[in-house]
């Protein structure tokens, strides 16, 4: 929760985030603001016509118009400042300064209440960072909040449902995650959005790892690698999970002989190297602790997921 040091912002619990979003929901006032400004302009114009022949009051309409222009200018400036702050939060999240970004996004939720688009982007940042920090129950709250405000068949809603399924799987609620994934799989397979298909493939990989179905995961390893490409650097998580599956089979598969186990181990190393070229090993393990056996030597990633705070 909030701290005087932005790098020490503690991620909220699911209950804290739910309460924060309930207290500061988005409010669509765009139409009201537009009609209010129009009414003020009409009032100023009418006042000008009424007082145009009154020397003592001739300047009042002009002053009213200047005041209206100042108000509209202030509103536009505030909107630009909020837009810049939201963009900055995204930039911080992309360079993995998670706690600083999370603290700023937390403050933006009430600040952006009257700007639904910016409000939604701030909540999206919160959901993303909570997932990266392994706070999956809280991430589910954020994803659920966003889903409730989109049509069920909206492309973004489908992606949010996939991410929520991943959060459920990572928090150990395998049945809930499996059910959520089955519900979205049909729509994802018929979608022309490659990112959505890649997200579903990633979710299935997470599911295979958490249920111990390593052989199923590697049976289509090459297709999975290709399918993950639209995710950009986040494909590294998929490469890491595939590497883990090969690693476990190289050590535990009773049907594999020594040469086969060596091949499995080599494939695991190649995939892990590919993953760590995109995302630091410590960050991969922080997001998916199951990957810890792939660290050489095994270390505690809790202190290295983010760059050191600037002095």
Outline where the language-model segments fall.
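Cytosolic juxtamembrane N-terminal segments of multi-pass membrane proteins
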Residues: 1-31
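Transmembrane-cytosolic junction motif
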Residues: 27-29, 67-96
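Hydrophobic alpha-helical transmembrane segments
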Residues: 50-65
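"A position-specific structural signal for the A-helix of alpha-solenoid helical repeats
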Residues: 83, 87, 118-125, 156, ...
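Structural motif corresponding to the intra-repeat A-B loop/turn of tetratricopeptide repeats
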Residues: 95, 133, 171, 211, ...
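Amphipathic alpha-helical segments of tetratricopeptide repeats
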Residues: 106-111, 144-150, 182-190, 222-230, ...
